Structures are given as C-alpha cells and as structure tokens.
Amino acid sequence: RGLGDVYKRQPLLNYTVSGVIWYQGESNVSRRNEYKDLLTAMISDWRQRWNKSDMPFYIIELADFLSPTDKGGRTAWAEFRKAQAEVADTNKNVTLIKNSDLGEWNDIHPLDKKTLGQRVAAAILIEMNTKNRK
C-alpha cells in the first residue's frame, strides 16, 4: 500500500457504499501468484474502513484474451482467473461474475458490454432479493 493509494481512497470514505463491482486485473497477471492474497486483503480493508463486514463484492472475471497459439500467456490468464475464483469461493459475500466467454483474442477489452452488464445486474438483484427475504 502506498501513500498515493490512501490519498485516492480517502475522499470516498465520506460516501455511502452498498457494494463494490471490481473490474480489474489485466495489469496484475504477472503477479497472479500473490493476487488472491492481495485482493482478499483489499476486500477486508475496504469492509473495515466502511464498517460493513458483509459489504458485497462482485469480481468481474478477467476476460479471455490472446491468440490461441500463445500457450504461455493463455495459461497465465487462466491461472489469474483461478485466483479470482478462489477469492470468491473463500470470502463471504463475494461473487465472481463470468466474463471469460466474452473476450476477444485481439482486444483486451471485450466488445460485448451489454451481456456483461446484464450479468452484473442479475448478480446484484439476486443478492438484494436474498437479503430482503431475511
């Protein structure tokens, strides 16, 4: 954690946050072996700072990317997605939203935003409806 990170986040603490949609990771594929611990620590930190131990986190799965012939790169991206899935599986109220099927081999940003948006909305609505039934 750097001082810049604290500076950037500090103003957000004045806002009410109901949940977090986390869509990030392309630049961290090279650190995939430590990503699970880093993301878990961030989730814990944000929940503590907002005083919401059950604040939902929605992790957008890293989209598939790279040519099918780039075996090393594709393996690294698959390992990164596995780390994302493990964070969702081992932390309360964390949901992984599938995105790997929407990727483009030649564009790091999937073109199909509508399908992903519908998946995110559906996950949030399921969580809200479950919470309202309790």
Question: Where on the chain are the PLM-derived regions?
Answer:
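Loop/turn elements at helix/coil->beta-strand transitions in domains of secreted/extracellular proteins
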Residues: 15-19, 52-58, 89-96
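Short, small-residue-biased leader/transition segments that mark boundaries at the very start
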Residues: 2-7
